[in-house]
Amino acid sequence: GKRVPVPEGFSAGARCLLESLNVFLSALAIMEQQGTEVSLASPGTWPLTPELTAECFLEAQPIFERQAAIWQNVLEDRADNRELEELDGFINNTSIRLRLICKETAVELPGDMYADCWEKHEIPPCTLVKLPHHGHRDSITPHLLDMLAPKTVVISVSNTRTDDCPAASVLQMVREKGCALYVTDAIPDSNGHVSNHLAIHFDI
């Protein structure tokens, strides 16, 4: 499949986007070879089983149009470092925000969306929310937590991350709201010790 160059002189964020695009292009080529049906996501509600429904939410169209224009320039060998840095600043807000509903249980899966983006919407309460962006400091706000009112909060994060994920301020915020908190990797204490921790597993 097609690959795009990753110029040494580009910023770290721009290079990361180009490397990610190459991973995506490789996966897309494999799916096409296998005859996999691929389509653009669109907002809507879909019954998955008689009891399970999926709701898909996307941000307004201009953000996707800008993203598409930048990627088109890359694919046509006109990659621009400044454009890619611009994209790096908003690409997380192009995430699909997915809500799974089964009877009285609602699970909110907001991708990597920044809190100041999706808290602008009227969002009904949920049973569980997986925090965006590995629990980074910009993943949640008190207002958003009040609106969602989750019983359980899940943070998907690796112990190898060095960018303050999950952020101590986020952990404190969630605990102060009285939510049950689960983290996929144990969080080292102040002495660097990693203890056993509760894990969470879904069967759908």
What are these regions (language model features)?
Residues 69-166:
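Active-site-proximal loop/helix segments of hydrolase catalytic cores
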